[in-house]
Amino acid sequence: MTGDWKNRPARVQLQESDLPSSVPPQTGLAFNVWYNKWSQGQSGSTRFVTPYSLDPENDSGITKGDKEGRIHFCLYFAKGMCCLGKNCRYLHHIPEPDDFARLALHSSALDCFGREKFADYRDDMGGVGSFKKPNRVLYVGGITGALNNKTLKPHQIENRVKYKFGKLGELDSVRYVESKNCAFVKFKLQCNSEFTKEAMGNQTLLIPTDKEWDLRKEGTGLLVKWANEDPNPAVRKRELEEQTQETLKAIKQLVASTEGTVNQKRKVEEINEVRDSQANSRERFSIRENAIIDKTILDKLKQRKVTITNTNVAANITVSKPSSVLPLVTQYSSDED
């Protein structure tokens, strides 16, 4: 994902009038407002292909969240259904290393969308995730339904998963397990795995060049969950070390870029000061150049003014006649006693 999104405002993905109802399709007799699901009906949830999807290249852009210094991403943007566009107060772009560093410095108890994590994973490995056990690996199931039963070779399926998921962040590895008909996708950064889990849920693996593309909504969509932790202690230790290194690397890059921005601002200010001083000196020089009276004539006039002033001062001085001298004290003699 390139940085072109920084030069344009985020676009509206969906008009507000076209937003779907928050109530899911009826599958039971009673609707539970607390869990947002139907009860007393069919067990299990019916999967489908969502009609909304994220187009990172065209949907990404600047929002109010960028201007306000927000660090969390828009959940509806990830699902391809944000109706606010540039007026959204959350971020509208694919998470980058600088975003990961800001999230890591802020809190590890919140995901990239600002939702609170839990101490443990859910039994079905869905949901927001755990703050005790960071996870960069996603389990991807429902591949057959996401392909509308299209027959592909194992390496073709793996490449298609890599193509679809690679748009949402830098991948560390992708492994397709043919016997289980599922895939495991590992990202470089955890924020990308959190973002992708929401963005790729109930999405299709078909591409526009497939002849089944027009019928993609008849499939069942992908099932994206958190992968279970590796039971090997050595692997868990290595994974923790890798995550720590990635976090430190991202924080160092963020600090370096911040310092570079500050230094660049200082250089710009210094250049502006030099330009202002040069402009002032040029202005003073132009005044001298374009003077009405020549400098030599001005000097002669100054000298003449000084001469005239001295003459006037001398003329104003008057000499008074000396007065008769009077004795200061009458002479005193002791003979008068």
UniProtKB/Swiss-Prot annotation:
Tree of life domain: Eukaryota
GO CC annotations, alphabetized: Prp19 complex; U2-type catalytic step 1 spliceosome; U2-type catalytic step 2 spliceosome
Keywords: Cell cycle, Metal-binding, mRNA processing, mRNA splicing, Nucleus, RNA-binding, Spliceosome, Zinc, Zinc-finger
Subcellular location(s) per record: Nucleus
Subunit-level organization: Associated with the spliceosome.
PANTHER family to which the protein is assigned, alphabetical: PRE-MRNA-SPLICING FACTOR CWC2 (PTHR14089:SF2), PRE-MRNA-SPLICING FACTOR RBM22 (PTHR14089)
Name by which UniProt lists this protein: Pre-mRNA-splicing factor CWC2
